[in-house]
Amino acid sequence: RDYYASRGLGDVYKRQVRFCDRQLGRVLDLMDELDLWKDTMLIVNTDHGFFLSEHGYWGKGGSPNYEELVHTPLFIWDPRSGRKGVHSPALVQTIDLAPTVLDYFGIEIPADMLGRPLTQTLADDTPVREYALFGYHSMPVGITDGRYTLLRDVKDFDEKTYEYTQMPTHMRAMFSVEEMRTATMAPGFSYTKGTPVMKIEARPNPRFLHTLKGGDMLFDLQNDPHQEHVLEDAEQSDRLLTAMTAAFEENDAPEEMYSRYGLSSTGRRRNK
């Protein structure tokens, strides 16, 4: 903490926020200048949050997925409803953005998309989901209903995980030769439209694997919005674990992921 604080990371972050604020202001000014509000949808969103010493962390990665990381800003202007200055209680995710844009332009939403169009939510707060699943590949996984959040730790670190892909590239590099030597062909998933995929042994960064230090974490966001106290409530934990299993099935998660997180598949998978 002292390392980052002494280097003024907080000040750098503030300057970046001011810069983004100015650039967003330019967009809003242009919307005014060209009178675009009457027929243009505007979406402002971020991909993830950033720790500035909260919970003892800086940046992101290697920490539990607290609200500071996963509860991101989302502002949407929809000229059809014309609602403004309203904070909606609806639980939504970034996967809802693409269906929302498609629906705005009257384009059919593909059956493979799990996101929901937010058209009615933007009009009158109609909910689109009961739960939201979130996390990083092979690391602790979270689920929330908007009030209670459960962070599920990895239960079987010996269970291998795989990357399923038709394009073997990481974010900043191609897959290595060593990784490609583990590749086999798999039949694919419900969303690959009947096409096979490469199944490549994943090699997660070990510093990300033990973020919960061996235990699940349940929080009541209504009474503990800063997630300072782990809640002991078996009923809520069981309910959220059931919802997590259902979300795994909806996402057509591979079988090894159930073992990794100590979940029992009911066999209700999406049709391929």
Task: Report each predicted region and the residues it spans.
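Polar, surface-exposed loop/tail segments
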Residues: 38-40, 85-145, 229
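WW-domain-binding short linear motifs
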Residues: 129-133, 255-262
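Generic recognition of well-ordered alpha-helical segments
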Residues: 71, 96, 100-104, 117, ...
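Single conserved hydrophobic/aromatic residue that forms the stacking wall/gate
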Residues: 2-13
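Short, solvent-exposed loop/helix junctions and linker helices
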Residues: 6, 88-91, 95, 212-215
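C-terminal, low-complexity/hydrophilic appendages and adjacent surface loops
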Residues: 67, 137-232, 270-272
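Histidine-centered active-site microenvironments of extracellular/periplasmic hydrolases
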Residues: 30-93
